[in-house]
UniProtKB/Swiss-Prot annotation:
One of its GO terms (molecular function) is 2-(3-amino-3-carboxypropyl)histidine synthase activity. Pathway: Protein modification; peptidyl-diphthamide biosynthesis. Belongs to the flavoprotein pyridine nucleotide cytochrome reductase family. It comes from Meyerozyma guilliermondii (strain ATCC 6260 / CBS 566 / DSM 6381 / JCM 1539 / NBRC 10279 / NRRL Y-324). The gene is CBR1. This is NADH-cytochrome b5 reductase 1. Monomer. Component of the 2-(3-amino-3-carboxypropyl)histidine synthase complex composed of DPH1, DPH2, DPH3 and a NADH-dependent reductase, predominantly CBR1.
Amino acid sequence: MSQNEPNPLVIFSTLAAIILAAVAVYVVKLNKKNGPVLKPDVFQKFPLIEKTRLSHNTCIYRFGLPKSTDRLGLPIGQHISIGATINGKEVVRSYTPISRDDELGYFDLLIKTYEQGNISRHVDSKSVGDHIEVRGPKGFFTYTPNMVEHLGMIAGGTGIAPMYQVLTAILTNPDDKTKISLVYANVTEEDILLRAELDLFAKEHPDRFKVHYVLNNAPENWNGSVGFVTPEIMEKHLPNKDQDGYLLLCGPPPMISAMKKNAVTLGYPKARPVSKLGDKVFVF
């Protein structure tokens, strides 16, 4: 080989080093991009990028993260706080995203707009491109895979949000064997939120997830229960107090008060005013 000819081994080694360096830089950047965006003590602005109306007063709002590869950074079972200045007063309310934390670039909120709901009306007034201010995570419940054998859930209305967050994380994780039983109460059949998603989960995981619907005003030929969630309904469709699991509750205050009393009737310990991780009866 002539002294002026390039050495193939040197060329190959140089190219390999360049490729490895590029891969290393990409991995570092990717890891940085996938870091959590949320900050517990600082409100940050996130733009509304999509609004899907489910009913006359309920929407799924999708908010964008700074980068398409960012994740929100919300542990399963935790929620976020939305803050706003309304009529000169600082108002803060908590909401649970229904999107998974491994869904990158955005997060989804299921919100029902109430006439007297300051934050819900504030969010509903937003157009695509407008921002809301969010901080988090917060909350006393953090789910980890296989932490219990069986979870019982009772949800009312938009109280389905934290339940959906938890059950989605469980049922999309092939290594998590936790069973889930959900009793979901609403006024009318049209009020049942995320029904298609819940029914699909029940169909795909018949041995691990069961959902029972309860309506105040039921149509003819209704297959679920009618009226309020009673101790009898709970006893039939939820795990009993002696099983390895928790009873999770989320819904309107009057409903939650009644569910706490029903739980005591069935032998569950009395729920604390502020629930903590490990409580047999946990209220979101």
